[in-house]
Swiss-Prot record:
Protein name: Cytochrome b6-f complex subunit 7
InterPro entries: PetM_cyt_b6/f_cplx_su7
GO function terms (MF aspect): electron transfer activity
Designated gene of the protein: petM
The protein's role, per its UniProt record: Component of the cytochrome b6-f complex, which mediates electron transfer between photosystem II (PSII) and photosystem I (PSI), cyclic electron flow around PSI, and state transitions.
Localization of this protein: Cellular thylakoid membrane
Subunit description: The 4 large subunits of the cytochrome b6-f complex are cytochrome b6, subunit IV (17 kDa polypeptide, PetD), cytochrome f and the Rieske protein, while the 4 small subunits are PetG, PetL, PetM and PetN. The complex functions as a dimer.
Top-level lineage group: Bacteria
Annotated GO CC locations: cytochrome b6f complex; plasma membrane-derived thylakoid membrane
Primary localization class, coarse: membrane
Transmembrane segments: 9-29
Keyword annotations from UniProtKB, A to Z: Electron transport, Membrane, Photosynthesis, Thylakoid, Transmembrane, Transmembrane helix, Transport
Species of the source: Synechocystis sp. (strain ATCC 27184 / PCC 6803 / Kazusa)
Amino acid sequence: MTAESMLANGAFIMIGLTLLGLAWGFVIIKLQGSEE
């Protein structure tokens, strides 16, 4: 595994985690809003 591929994989992982975080936060907000 080269350094370039490691950097590329790291970038994809960061993007994936960011999207998951945004989606998870959106779901939590929707659930909290529906409870009230």
